[in-house]
Amino acid sequence: WYLRMLRDSPAAAERLCHILSSSRYITDLLEDAPTSITWLDKVADLQPLSAGALKAEITSLLSRHEDSADAMRAVRYLRRREILRIAMGDALNLLSVQQVCTGLATVDERTIGAALALAEREEVKAGERDEETAPQKSDAPQSDSQDAAGESSEDEQQNPLLTEITVIAMGRLGGAENGFGSDADVMFVHRPVEGADEKEAQAQANRIVNRLMQLIKQPVRPAIRAERPLEVDADLRPEGKQGALVRSLDSYRAYY
């Protein structure tokens, strides 16, 4: 099929020859994604996807994969695909420096966002399992205070997430100045939901963020050929490596 496309599109054939002779990195990526050659026929296909388009595609991927490892592999493959798209456009001088940097930053932001969504989804499922295995309520009459406590407990069970987590982009990622080898400098902040126990919220935030980091860097099966895994660096946080990986909003406010 691609030979027909190259025969019918001299521009695509010329672009392919240019890429293969100028970039070993792109050549390695193309070997595992030959359908990407079709992008060479249209300049529009060599433009970085918008943040909205990436979000929609990633949301669809997550909904189709119940297993977090499988879902994250799909997201990481998408990231590699989009890096290839940007690299091809860059090699052919079809993109400005700003387009390249912003495109790469957007892909990494969405990848981190996907890992956060998966980690939170796991936490919700764990909470639902705990609720299912919890002892059933007694049918004995309860006082007003017990009723109120029961309602509060039921509300907490309906929403297993005790805190809201945000990832703050720093460095090159924060300034949308990414290169092809850039890592992602970030800080993690959380805000307990109203009525949540602060210690429990902090413990949950720690679990979610540690799982996020694991999903991004752990080996996937089958391995993604020529993947350069995203390196997430949270060392710019208060107290560096010795400090808490994720802090509450109030903690950041007090620190600064």
What is each model feature region?
Residues W1-Y256:
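Non-catalytic regulatory/linker segments of enzymes
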